[in-house]
């Protein structure tokens, strides 16, 4: 009877050790997979999917089941990873996965198309008597434009932030006339079979012309006072193509895997290329202000400062020509922040990206994120009007990385390493 009890005890101890080893093997394999995927995405490595085999080992820890009972499940990933799993006749725990080590993943590559949602927030702030900012948020541009325009077979969206100075007339004019200024061009009435490089080039040309026409329209004193002007930051999304155009010191910042990517440059004296451009044209700064009066080096309006020749070529350092950045969105691009200088005067691009990303992880609402970021700028003592637009390119926020911790004795670790090395 004693012998029987001792045998049962030894069997139970052996079974317990086997369960522990099995669990450690599972964790070890999954750790290898995570590290390999992390290395792949961080280094942009590409491998032939035909040579790849990845398995996900799932265990069922139940005393009623055989401890060697593993479930091998194929998993899908966007890129290819190769993991070698050793097999040995002396390691029965791995016998069940040895035959699966040549499993090939069928890689389903689909073109990323953003699922767009947005939110905005605006506040005149504690130090300004009037609100001079305006903004636009259109998540479904095709529906907004109506039947007279070509309905693109991909999502279209349009956003703008306009920071007025010398009054709100100029920023209000751009907002109220944005659809006719930016989308009356023939490029939006044609039917392109594909959004290719030729179409995108025509789109950029059309956008530059829209900025020029908007500036010329405000030359008329009956529309806008000559002492009034505005910055203009716009973002146009067509499928997975993003185009950002900027005149002035509003800023657009893209979040790519948590990192801030500036999609525009501040047109002001602190931006060295702009300072050189102004000075090369005979302009000068008093402190950080153009002619001691204007905080920006590019703007729409401000005709009391601009001088034009009869041919329409600008002779003034103050111009309305936008900087335009284009890019193709991927799964790594999470959201875009657009804000006036009242935001960027008190925080960096990375600060804003981290702040919004944390908000999206908490509640997933871009409207609430825009409000929280705007209020954060006010909390940091912004002295200007504050306007924020947050555009999400995915319906779900980036998940936080799970961290699994477990402790293994030196003896168990050594035995596991010996077993894995065969």
Swiss-Prot record:
GO terms for molecular function: metal ion binding; protein serine/threonine phosphatase activity. The keyword Manganese applies. It comes from the Eukaryota. Pfam families: PP2C (PF00481). Transmembrane segments: none annotated. Residues 117-393 form the PPM-type phosphatase domain. Binds 2 magnesium or manganese ions per subunit. InterPro entries: PP2C, PP2C_BS, PPM-type-like_dom_sf, PPM-type_phosphatase-like_dom. Its EC number is 3.1.3.16. Its cofactor is Mg(2+); Mn(2+). Belongs to the PP2C family. This is Probable protein phosphatase 2C 43.
